[in-house]
Amino acid sequence: NVKNICLSGGYALNCVANFKLRQSLPKDINLYVEPVSHDAGTAIGAAKLLYHEMRMLEGITDDPIIPQTTVKYGFQNHYPATYDFARFKKTKVTNKDVAKKLSENKIVALFKDRSELGPRALGNRSILFNPNNSKAKDIVNKVKNRESYRPFAGTILHEDCKQYFDMNVLDESPFMMYAVKAKNYSLKGIRHVDGT
């Protein structure tokens, strides 16, 4: 009679296992994978439970915990925090500007708005590159000082995700908690050896 399953903890960060579990469950069972699946997520859950008990609410909000609920920073905060690592000048950048840089195979570091909570880069603290550029991931791995076998995730508009990825039983993966197969093999810059 279970209709809702929630995964949390370190094992919930296994994107491949999460997707296989979602595929194996009947469609009428909801699977929620906590995007802050580490100690900070436990603290958030404890705070929500205490809030629920103190307020004597009938139910906790249906709103998901969005891993971008922290303080919003402006340029005056960004500049001193990054001055020792990079020199830059203040410029207003639009999504179109970022898209143009990516189309020119430039690597773009996004540092904007609210900090993110959890282990995944979700757009406010992200390193972006053209997913068709197979050499870019080596550069990003070097910048991040990480192993070459580590996978990358694509960022895509919701309405376009099924065109590029085999979402199967999923409608979306907003917090990078599922590994899905890439349909378009031109995405060589982000496609992992297993096709995800």
What name fits each language-model region?
Residues 2-10, 109:
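Short glycine-rich phosphate-binding loop at a beta-alpha junction
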